[in-house]
Amino acid sequence: ITELKEDRQNQTPFFTKLKEYAESNPTPFDVPGHKLGRNSQELIDYVGQNMFLLDSNAPLGLDTLGHPTGVIKEAMQLAAEAFHAKKAYFLTNGTTVGILAMIMSICRAKEKIILPRNVHKSAINALILSGAMPIFVKPDIDSDLGIANGLSFSSVKKAIDRHPDAKAVFIINPTYFGMTSEIVKITEYAHEAGMIVMADEAHGADFYFSDKLPISAMDAGCDISATSMHKTAGSLTQSSFLLTQGDRIDHSRLQSTLNMLHSTSPSSLLIASLDVARKQMYFEGKEKIDKVLTLAKKARTQIKQISGLEVVDKTYVHERGNFDFDELRLIIKVSELGITGFEAYKELRRKFNIQLELAESHLILAVLSYSTTKDDIDHLIIALKDLSKRYYRIRHKLPKVKFSYSFPETYSRPRDAYHAPKKEVLLSEAGGEVAAEMIMIYPPGIPLVIPGEIISEAVLEDLNFYVENGSTLHCDLDNGCIKVVDKENWPKWESEEEDEF
């Protein structure tokens, strides 16, 4: 059986067929307009002709993503097998479209969904599009690092008990910083309550290929998971999988929802990269992840010896009551150097050409993957030692991290506020108003305010703090204003009437 499985997993149905087409030298009277790259010399000189030959638009024999019956279907079946799932769907609009599709296909208007407040913006957008009612659960907060972590079982159990009519529970596995929740216990309890369990696994694709990383959503029993193959497992940016198992998912409705959200011209390059990356991770993932975990362990040992720096490890995580942690995330606290994470991020990029994943007020985040090398780690250590040499003891350490993770009071469903009459107000004068748009810091793309929440002074202070320290504020307007509900012209304001949809 194992040999048969390996024979299957050694295949790349879509990529193989795509290569056959590219090598057949067709006369193109179809789109795309570059016609196999005939007039794209500047880009060809850099990336090569083959990229254009592979950039086809579903010619005969290459199947259709919206209704797969041939090589795409075969490739998705192999992906499902590799990822311990019943079905797998290719996503060429990123995990974002997977999260949109799972929530929209499962939750109808006004149906409740239990989810952590530190969800990605795509989950909030799905609430707006579906009309579902969020029941937010506060994540565990690490006040020393200034980050939101996973969910405890007790907090989710309390929400399930209080809202037994909820349709689904949504879990992040893991967070941007690699922290996981008690996903097995949460899933089992939610299933006992008759709820569907969804997972945002944007940063956990590699969990399926190593027992030394946290448990994956499918292995934990979740019904559906969106996982970014491109973030940690080697496919091209914007390519992901949507995985399902069990009998709780309406696959016909799910496919229909995906077809509503996906482009009708999906990138063959992205699909091919998913096909090939799946094969590579199946055969090489475990060994490569083992090697990079060894590098990560050595990196932590070295960083701990650098004056003014601290690095998170599993001992730190467990001592603070968190469940598990992806050790391929190097969370490095730099505030003892007297500089912010934002300053360290810029210094490492400008002086050492090191591109980190993100910065927060007191820390920086470096993401390792199966492709990280010893030379990469050595270069990072040299750069961190340089930071320490230049800043430690020269400047005073930063004050204790300012991180309250204030939760604004919810007044209405996100959908109601999004469609309500609006007006523009200065962000500095928005206290007490009902938000009509999302306001977030990016990365990581977690909204500090969502439509339907009452903007508090505490949230405004948090936003100002991030902006003053170099973060990018994402909102709809660029004139210092935000959109809020025009309460005087909104019949719902101080009314018991509910919107119909």
Language model: regions and residue ranges:
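N-terminal "arm"/small-domain region of PLP-dependent enzymes with the aminotransferase-like
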Residues: 1-70
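Conserved N-terminal alpha-helix of the aminotransferase class I/II PLP-enzyme fold
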Residues: 52-94
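Conserved beta-loop-alpha segment that forms the PLP phosphate-binding cup at the N-terminus of a helix
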Residues: 87-113, 126
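PLP-dependent aminotransferase-like
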Residues: 110-171
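Active-site phosphate-binding strand-loop segment of PLP-dependent enzymes
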Residues: 145-206
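Active-site PLP attachment segment
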Residues: 216-255, 262-273
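Structural signature of PLP-dependent enzymes
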Residues: 277-300
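Conserved C-terminal alpha-helix-loop-beta "cap" of PLP-dependent enzymes
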Residues: 298-477
